[in-house]
Amino acid sequence: MATNYIFVTGGVVSSLGKGIAAASLASILEARGLNVTIMKLDPYINVDPGTMSPTQHGEVFVTQDGAETDLDLGHYERFIRSKMSKANNFTSGKIYSEVLRKERRGDYLGATIQVIPHITNEIKARVIEGGKGRDVVIVEVGGTVGDIESLPFLEALRQLAVDVGREKTLFMHLTLVPYIPTAGEVKTKPTQHSVKELLSIGIQPDVLICRSDRTIPANERKKIALFCNVPERAVISLKDVDSIYRIPELLKSQALDSFVCDRFRLECPEADLSEWEQVLYRQANPTGEVTIGMVGKYVELPDAYKSVNEALKHAGLTSRLSVNIKYIDSQDIETKGTELLDGLDAILVPGGFGYRGVEGKIRTAQYARENNIPYLGICLGMQIALIEYARNVAGLTEANSSEFDPACSQPVIGLITEWQDESGNVETRTDKSDLGGTMRLGAQQCHLIEGTKAREIYGAEAIVERHRHRYEVNNVLLPTIEAAGLKVSGVSADRKLVEIIEVPNHPWFIAAQFHPEFTSTPRDGHPLFAGFVAAAKAYQDSRKA
């Protein structure tokens, strides 16, 4: 079967939820037996989000093959079974870098390099490559129609629709239909102007997803259909809902999936959304509530920890618990003390980079360890837990990470300077290397030690988890820390790197170098987060007893 393409754009304002809408449609089509993937095209000039500020851009989502991508790819993986890869996300910066590399290499035979055709051809080639072997590929274009940055992407998709045939392409446009309280009605004019903007660059939308805080009345949908030149059945009302996992059913109830299948002439069974119904039932009927403190350095923007937030909620679904997340700035722990941690059922310290707020995180780990509060450390959250244990239990009072103190006399965490790639080539990396090139990225195998809590939680000897870090546990000082009681419960495939640590004489104190949040989904959850939330409930019950 030839690949069919759905191009998703947004208009009027940003943050309408293009990624959620695209992922929700993909989940319905997947439930109909189709092989679906989703791509995100980001117009910004950065090569990838890897070095962008989490407080501006949100989290960096890491794929199985080690790509540092937009957080929307996390949404995609949480909604569909198909896994994302490097091919599923690219930016203007990546496109321009590749075109300039080809120009320097002489691939264009001295031609004058222009946006059309060279940039647009590169975009089209990547979209086609990313969709190979799929029944449907949904392509989301970041930003808002009318932005200067997105014009080459929209032009490339317009051309691609001509190249592959309009019968194999569908343009889906999200717009805002605001409700004006003083008028007592929704207004369609912003949608009409947004479609006019699209038409000016040669794109006629086939489907309009109309975002509003309420269901859009039938007469207003007819008006939108008339003035925007789309079938009435292709004007979809997408109101605000209490859970993003309700959106697949909302789209299916308006037969969007049927419209898509009819358009592409796809013969496939009706979608079975019973798994999503179960998710919504568990979400709506919790048997209790736990409060988990997330102590981080980017807490002013919760999207900086998007996958962690979602993984905690997924674990709540598994345990039939409502998870209340209390965000605490680790710098506040340094200035106001650990009193900010009082009353929590569990504590989580997520990943991060740089020295700011680190001592607050170390004090947080100490507080959790000494007060028998369930603790989950992720990436940096593991490293600071190790530093805390080394200082306060193992007697290594000068323990630190060379990331925070390069002259540290007891660097229990250090930079690995020699890395071996899949081909066996050794690459030297130092603190002077480009930031994007010094990471241990993507899925790595981890072996779990018999008799540990980690082995019990996972129920397996070997697991695969995703990494994003450049510093590791220093094996030279590790024996001293282990002799003081800390247990290494997970190691890398070659048994050389520490992946998981735990405190044996603590009810639940586990920290991992990898990022388990990237593989958690609402339908399946993740064993580490499920165990953590269950431990939070047990701790809560013990305090009430």
Swiss-Prot record:
Alphabetical keyword list: ATP-binding, Glutamine amidotransferase, Ligase, Magnesium, Metal-binding, Nucleotide-binding, Pyrimidine biosynthesis
Record's protein name: CTP synthase
Matches recorded under HAMAP family: PyrG
GO biological process, any: pyrimidine nucleobase biosynthetic process
Documented activity regulation: Allosterically activated by GTP, when glutamine is the substrate; GTP has no effect on the reaction when ammonia is the substrate. The allosteric effector GTP functions by stabilizing the protein conformation that binds the tetrahedral intermediate(s) formed during glutamine hydrolysis. Inhibited by the product CTP, via allosteric rather than competitive inhibition.
PANTHER family: CTP SYNTHASE (PTHR11550), CTP SYNTHASE-RELATED (PTHR11550:SF0)
EC number: 6.3.4.2
Pathway: Pyrimidine metabolism; CTP biosynthesis via de novo pathway; CTP from UDP: step 2/2
Binding site for ATP: 15-20, 72, 239-241
Encoding gene (name): pyrG
Naturally occurring in which organism (per UniProt): Haemophilus ducreyi (strain 35000HP / ATCC 700724)
One Pfam family in the UniProt entry: CTP_synth_N
Major enzyme class: ligase
Oxidoreductase as UniProt keyword: no
Positions with a binding annotation for L-glutamine: 352, 380-383, 403, 470
Annotated binding of CTP, by residue: 14, 147-149, 187-192, 223
Binding site for UTP: 14, 187-192, 223
Higher taxonomy: Bacteria, Pseudomonadati, Pseudomonadota, Gammaproteobacteria, Pasteurellales
InterPro entries recorded: Class_I_gatase-like, CTP_synthase, CTP_synthase_N, GATASE, GATase1_CTP_Synthase, P-loop_NTPase
